[in-house]
């Protein structure tokens, strides 16, 4: 049997007042997701250990069977591996966002979802100013980049998406790398202030990328191969470096899809078709990750989150029509509209294709929590359980 796990990043939510106390999953029209839940078996899963912050890095690693307490080093390290960045044993890689700071507050953790081309121009100017510090900047997709610090010692940092609307001073880096990271941030603010890219963005009514925000730095992770753990060849389809970093560390195939953006305008159907085609080859398992639902949660947009769920559901429908195997559906964590950031609450999952069913009628948080026959499953046990046919 072959297996496909469809993951809507941040898709789970809390009751929303604007929706009459319902969640986006309860309001969205999603007949295909509901079919998986209705005809299959369901359960709840805690994807983030109490010892870790509720990030997509930790949650996705955990779902794939890797204990974050044992294998996780940092988000920056995973994204650096994905980008093929030279990574020595004494180096630390930090995730590095372009952000918008206004009146000393974190206005926008994604700098208006700056384009990758604009980001490259900003980084080229900043790298020139930082050339004497030995630091290397590697532009990624949109606002997501990597800062490589040779000889780094570590720093306590805060994810910028967790502090939107708050003063940044209490959340500046602390620890051994703090002074140098803060220096880089100050220099970036100076370099970006009158940069042509930002002048054009401001003129167009867009948020400028007026500073960098380094966070989640760590050493290169050492993880066992997915094929050795499970005896199956795995592949990952995504649009973000984080997921590709996990895949490369785990020895899984990386499948990139034209038109997959990691944002609301991603090519949902293109990803679904790529998943089906990949499973026609020698891959036994495909992990299909969609970021758009998470981005909508961070924006606090009920409309966009419902739209993202419904567009993902169309892709799920294509998969159900064209793939005859085991299909799993779940989020990695909630990204509640009201909070605009991740939480560590358990998430609902559904499995179709292993036989058996329960009393669940629709794919929603409440329905599955009340009626799912799997109960509460440990995230690192999911694939072992599914591959064993349970």
Segments from the language model and where they lie:
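Feature captures the catalytic ectodomains and active-site-proximal regions of enzymes
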Residues: 1-390
